[in-house]
Structure formats: C-alpha cells, structure tokens
Swiss-Prot record:
ATP binds at Q207, L208, R209, N210, G301, R302, D303, H304. Its EC number is 2.7.7.4. The lineage of its organism: Eukaryota, Amoebozoa, Evosea, Archamoebae, Mastigamoebida. Sulfate binds at Q207, R209, A305. This is Sulfate adenylyltransferase. One of its GO terms (biological process) is hydrogen sulfide biosynthetic process.
Length: 423
C-alpha cells in the first residue's frame, strides 16, 4: 500500500481530525506583528506546554483554553460540555487585576518567560471566570483525588491565579522544543507520517518520564509482540525537582533502541507537556493525545503517572472501565489501554517477568522502578545489572556524578516502588 493509504488506515484523531492552532511563515509573521501591539499576559510553563499541544494538534479537538462549563463538566463527567470525552482541565489563569481589564472579544498576547521567541501566542477572550479556593479544591479532589498540598499537581492548581480566561488561541511559538530535541520532539502529523512509512496500523505508546529501565524495556517488547510497532514517547516538558532531565533520558533511550530493539518495530518521540502527576486521570489524558499521535493502544503499567502513595498501583488501569461511552466515535476515546500486571526481575526466572508468567515468591523478585533508580543513583550507589542495560546505566551514573549538589533532592520510595503491595 502507498504511504497515503497507510495514513488513511491509522486511527482517527480525537474529534475526527487534527485541530492545529499553530501558524507558520508569513501568516505567523503577520500574527506576531499584530500581537506586539496587544496587551500581554504572562503564562506558566504548564500553560505554555498546553498552548504548544493545541498548536500542533496534540490536544485535538481543543482549540483554546476551557470555559467554566467545560471545566466543570471535565471535572465531574470526564467530558466537555458538548459530551466529547476529555479527562483533565486545560485552563489558563490570570490575576484579579488582569481579569478586570479583560473583555469578551478582546485579543491578548501570551508570553511564557522562558520562551525563546518574543510572543508565545494570542487568545481571543470568550469568558473570564473566578476560581475560588472552593473551586480549586473541587478540581483537585476530582482530578487528583486529594487536596493535599504535598501533591505536586495539587500545589500547582492551588497556586494558580484567582481567575481563568477562556477562548480560542493562536499558537505562535513551539519554544525551544524543536531545536533542543531535534529528531525527538514530534508533532502528531510527523508521528503519523512515520507510522505510515513503516506500514504500521496498530501502535502502542509507551509513556516515559523516567529513564528507560528494564521494566520499561519489558513493557515495550510485550507491546511489539501484539502490535505492529511501539512508540516510545517521552515527556520533554517540566518535571518535579529530583526527576531526570529529558536530554539525559533521551540518551538512555537511544542507547537501548540502538542495541536491544529491532529498529523497524520501534520509534522514539517527545512531546512538550509538563507532568501533572494526575495518576488515573492523567493516564486518560495520555491515551487521548496518543490517539491524536496515531496510537491505537496505550501501555498502562503499575502506578501510571502516579506520585507518592496517592493512587492504588492499578487505579490508572481501572479508570478506563469507568469512563462514559458515547455512540459517536468522534466524541469517545478510541485508543485502548494495554493493561500489564506487576513486572519485576526474578532471580529464579533469571530475567524480567510478571505475575502472569512468574510462579515464584516475593523474595525472589526485585521491583525495577524509576523512583528506585533515581534514589540509588542520587545516593551514589551502584545499580545492579538487572535494573538496566549497561549503556544506559553509565549515562545515568555520569549525570549524577556531575550533578550540582544544590540540585540533589531526597527521594522517598512509595510502597509500590518497593513491591510491598504486590501479592
């Protein structure tokens, strides 16, 4: 089949087509010229990542920041107000002083202070609405299942400014993502074209925010056995303190793919979001935008997108069985979860295994987790061989060896990272 035929056979984007708010070339230049004369609002790192995702079509069918009715429906019903599935609010906040100056129909320039370009985008104001402390707490309880300020996602929401601004956006910058992560950072159009060139139709996405260790490799290879290919898709936006930067993680993946994967069955990519640490809800978001990237399946393992002990080890799998069904395929989530049980290194099996394949006991097993990898390396300890491939472990050891002491944080092991909760 031709590349175009292969493209046509890929899973449809959420909403039926890719909605892209990013401008290019002369049109972008004209928009920037206009934006420089507009009032300006500073946006956060998270908001900038969301703006870029809307720009490249990753958040299709969204074309702007959410109105209050959409925000409320997403929190309570997992859908936009029109019934289209969406699991996490995509909002932009402003101060009370800024809110008083904004009017419906007004256009405002958006700027992220670390953007390498002068203007990040614009928004045409549709609605300005207050977010009281009670509103924010409701969002946190619905999305993160907690209002505990120690939860990094909760902390971000509670620190947001007191008003949200809704409206259609125009994205005028992708920041440094295409330059810093050249060849890795990928738009949905680019991933779809890559899949079509490879002749793939069924694709499993592997979400990564930690260095790729043996459990990740095991998950990816399970997926390759049942799908045409696996898309190793790394977050290249901001993480919490103590997490390993994307450029280091990308090197680890490169080393693994180069020596331990059949190259025609794997593709590495990156996406521009900040991590929300939303556990089950974020797992749904990961599946939603992977549909836009062209993936039919989303690998969901233990404690997907989790942090601390806020979620059960497989809550992120269970939530897929609870989301609303819509008869209209354009309005429902089409990408399916690939649910995988506890994975670990078993000394008696002499390799990676899962509860479905290993008959041995807890004492024979070693849980391989990103948290454990970061904790041991940050404490100057040497990781056992079964935690990762030698090539990637060397990259990680070199990173920690040269890490400024002021950037080191104490890493606590949650119970799922130790395997205590495993049967």
């Amino acid at each position: 089949m031709s590349i175009q035929e292969n493209l046509n056979n890929l899973i449809k984007p959420h909403g039926g087509k890719l909605i892209k708010t990013l401008k290019y070339g002369a049109e972008r230049d004209e928009c920037i010229k206009e934006a420089k004369s507009l009032p300006k609002i500073d946006i956060s790192s998270r908001e900038f990542g969301d703006l870029v995702m809307m720009g490249i079509g990753g958040f299709s069918p969204l074309n702007g920041f959410m109105k209050k009715e959409d925000w409320f429906s997403v929190c309570k019903n997992f859908t936009l107000a029109d019934g289209t599935f969406w699991p996490i609010p995509i909002t932009m906040s402003v101060s009370e002083e800024e809110a008083k100056k904004l009017k419906r129909g007004q256009k405002v320039a958006l700027k992220y202070n670390k953007d390498i370009n002068d203007i990040s985008g614009t928004i045409e104001i549709d609605q300005v609405y207050e977010m009281t402390k009670k509103d924010k707490e409701m969002e946190c309880k619905d999305i993160f299942t907690t209002t505990d300020s120690d939860h990094p996602g909760v902390k971000k929401v509670m620190e947001q400014k007191p008003f949200n601004v809704a409206g259609k956006v125009t994205t005028l910058s992708e920041g440094e993502f295409p330059i810093k992560y050249k060849g890795i950072y990928m738009t949905p159009e680019e991933s779809r074209l890559n899949f079509a060139k490879k002749g793939w139709k069924t694709i499993a996405a592997l979400q990564l925010r930690n260095p790729m260790h043996r459990s990740h490799e095991f998950l990816a290879k399970i997926a390759v056995e049942v799908c045409d290919g696996v898309f190793i898709h790394s977050l290249v936006g901001n993480l919490k303190p103590g997490d390993i930067p994307a450029e280091v993680r990308v090197k680890c993946i490169d080393a693994l793919v180069d020596k331990y994967f059949v190259k025609k069955n794997v593709l590495q990519g990156g996406y521009p979001l900040d991590m929300r640490y939303g556990g089950p809800r974020e797992a749904l978001l990961h599946a939603t935008f992977r549909q836009n990237y062209g993936c039919t399946h989303m690998i969901i393992g233990r404690d997907h997108a989790g942090v601390g002990d806020y979620y059960g080890p497989f809550d992120a799998q269970k939530i897929f069985d609870k989301i609303p069904y819509n008869a209209d395929p354009k309005k429902r989530l089409l990408t399916q979860p690939m649910k995988i049980d506890w994975t670990f290194y078993c000394h008696k099996c002499d390799g990676m295994a899962s509860l479905r394949t290993c008959p041995h006991t807890k004492k024979d097993r070693v849980i391989v987790s990103g948290t454990m990898v970061r904790k041991m390396l940050s404490e100057g300890k040497t990781l056992p061989d079964h935690f990762g491939r030698a090539e990637s472990l060397k990259i990680l050891a070199d990173y920690y060896q040269h890490l400024d002491k002021s950037k080191k944080v104490t890493i606590k092991l949650q119970k799922f990272a130790t395997g205590d909760a495993m049967k």
